[in-house]
Amino acid sequence: MKNYQFSTALLSSQIQGKKLRFPCPAKINLFLYITSQRSDGYHELQTLFQFLNFGDWLSIEIRTDGKIILTPEIPHLKNEDNLIYRAAKLLQQKTGCTLGANLHLDKILPIGGGVGGGSSNAATALVALNYLWNTQLSLSTLAEIGLQLGADVPVFVYGKAAFAEGVGEKLTFCQPPQKWFLVLKPETSISTAIIFKDSNLPRNTSKRPLAELLTTKYENDCEKVVLNHYSEVEEALGWLLQYAPARLTGTGACVFAEFANEQAAQSAFLDKPEKYVGFVAQGTNISPLHQMIEYLSQQKQTLCLPNNTNSRG
């Protein structure tokens, strides 16, 4: 896996005439507690999302014919079912925008790792196209659209580290320490359904205020159940624990260790067994996507072709 991080210099270098490359950052769950199971089967939780300065890239070039062209195609997945394509079409439908786009995804994050790759891709499509098409929807409206695509998409749309409650829909923005992380992807994929159906999964962890949670040891209620089902995750986590405090993110499969500085994280990364893909990144409380949008706005870099007179808020 490519090992580089988003940076201000890297983001600013993505300006390429009428084509831009927008970051789709990874996220980790610094903690995750399951507080109850509702009558409809959904689980209520308390979790803390933080972005990483590492992720996929989505290249966008505006079209005037209204077509949405997405490359490359993913085997066994029609483009019409891809979250990026669906995000673009939903934005067109919501605003009446007559512009289109060529979209190209440079996939770097591991698929099925629990670091939010698909949700981040969809959010980047919404936020970036809203900027480029000049459709001028608010972040809250974009988040409502994003919720149709996935429960985690609104977090990426808002672009701020957040404490989530309920089934993930209640967000409180916050600023946890921006530590360095080594993230590993074991050679397995997790079935979320298996984890949440397991009778050993904690479902009654006491709800606590954010201030208390931020000052206590971070844990993940899904971790023990995942380790019981997936020995590959248990092995990867055990390796990380030799170097630093480590946990599962979400329901996995990715695990991460936290370090006080980049040097310590990179040193551990160099010892990584070859069978693991992984990367070193720093936590960031402002999404690199929003950092780039802010940079473009300051530079008055306008890539909308004709003004989109058919848009509406």
Curated annotation (Swiss-Prot):
One of its GO terms (biological process) is isopentenyl diphosphate biosynthetic process, methylerythritol 4-phosphate pathway. ATP binds at P110, I111, G112, G113, G114, V115, G116, G117, G118, S119, S120. Gene3D superfamilies: 3.30.230.10, GHMP kinase, C-terminal domain. Its EC number is 2.7.1.148. The keyword ATP-binding applies. Keywords: ATP-binding, Isoprene biosynthesis, Kinase, Nucleotide-binding, Transferase. GO terms for molecular function: 4-(cytidine 5'-diphospho)-2-C-methyl-D-erythritol kinase activity; ATP binding. It catalyses: 4-CDP-2-C-methyl-D-erythritol + ATP = 4-CDP-2-C-methyl-D-erythritol 2-phosphate + ADP + H(+). Pathway: Isoprenoid biosynthesis; isopentenyl diphosphate biosynthesis via DXP pathway; isopentenyl diphosphate from 1-deoxy-D-xylulose 5-phosphate: step 3/6. The keyword Hydrolase does not apply. The active site is at K27, D152. It is an enzyme of class 2 (transferase). It holds the Pfam family GHMP_kinases_C. InterPro entries: GHMP_kinase_C_dom, GHMP_kinase_C_sf, GHMP_kinase_N_dom, IspE, Ribosomal_Su5_D2-typ_SF, Ribsml_uS5_D2-typ_fold_subgr. Belongs to the GHMP kinase family. IspE subfamily. Catalyzes the phosphorylation of the position 2 hydroxy group of 4-diphosphocytidyl-2C-methyl-D-erythritol. This is 4-diphosphocytidyl-2-C-methyl-D-erythritol kinase. The gene is ispE.
